[in-house]
Amino acid sequence: MKKRIICICMAALLSLSFLAGCGAEGNTDTEQDAAAQTVTVRLSEVTHSVFYAPQYVAMSQGFFADEGLDIDLSNGGGADKVMTAVVSGGADIGLAGPESCIYIHGQGKDDLPVIFAQLTKRDGSFLVGRTDEDFDWSNLKGKTIIGGRKGGVPEMTLEYVMRHNGVEPQGDAVVDTSVQFNMMAGAFTGGQGDYVTLFEPTATEVERAGHGYILCSIGEESGEIPYTAYFAARSYMDAHPEVIQGFANAIARAQQWIVEHTDREVAQAIIDQFPDTDLDTLEAVTARHRQIDAWNAAPMMARSALERLETVMTEAGELTKAQWVDFDALVDNSFAEKAMESMK
């Protein structure tokens, strides 16, 4: 009898072990299936800035994850470098000024980059000077402004605004284009130039450190232009339309999320992206971007906005009217439009 009881107990234990093993195996299969369904997207951004808050909101709020996307984010350090990464296959999607796409289209390459979503709708940089002056654009005459890479949207927009305020670049004032984009703040605080254009949170950090003063928003002066947008090689878009659609969906949700939430809530959502910046600074910077209406509320690009950018490029001498790109060849709004439809 005793032996029989022992045998029954051992059989029960073996059954429980088998069931537990099946359960563990089932969980592993589920986890593996979930991992298999997640697609890693290599995203190269032109710089790391609060200006791109909707992107970081999409990451922190799980909007990309909801679409089965895992974002591998890298800082390209300039639009030209982002474009190089995309066309060489080093990145799947790029975030930079559309001018980089326009230049490539003018070269007649086979696998051209195509814009599928717009993130920001005006220049997000701020003019920083060495004194807390009562600023007028005429103050730039006889001075040197660190303006970024020649042919880049920040530099061209600065020159566009200067001309429209009666200051001729390289005539009335010098626009220094020798400093790399990610070195501009360091050059200015190191004593180079009289003014510099900086993105946030760098502009506020320079001001709070006592190295300069924010004088005006370049974007408020320039008007709306498609300042930064997402693009991918046509071959990648054709091969992975579901990835592009999911990406556009996440960005559209994030843009709407920002509209519906306070500056403090936006700052809290993106703070992990800026570990060296405190919450109050991020809130102030977010408010500044909202005040100048920097972010798109929807990811579609307007034809008129692209034409204004091409006007800026033409006035800068980087593009002739004959080199203007066909809108439909450069921009595919279908993904952005579907993203907005899915939110209704």
Whereabouts are the PLM-identified features?
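Short, glycine-/small- and polar/acidic-enriched structural segments
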Residues: 31-171, 175-180, 194-200, 211, ...
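Short amphipathic alpha-helical segments at helix boundaries and their inter-helical linkers
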Residues: 91-94, 290-304, 335-344
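Short, low-complexity disordered leader/linker segments with a strong preference
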Residues: 1-40, 340-344
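Conserved C-terminal helix/tail region of periplasmic/extracytoplasmic solute-binding proteins
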Residues: 310-344
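Secondary-structure end/capping motifs
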Residues: 238-320
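Extracytoplasmic/secreted envelope proteins and their assembly/folding machinery
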Residues: 52, 83, 87, 98-101, ...
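Pocket-lining segment of extracytoplasmic ligand-binding domains
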Residues: 182-274
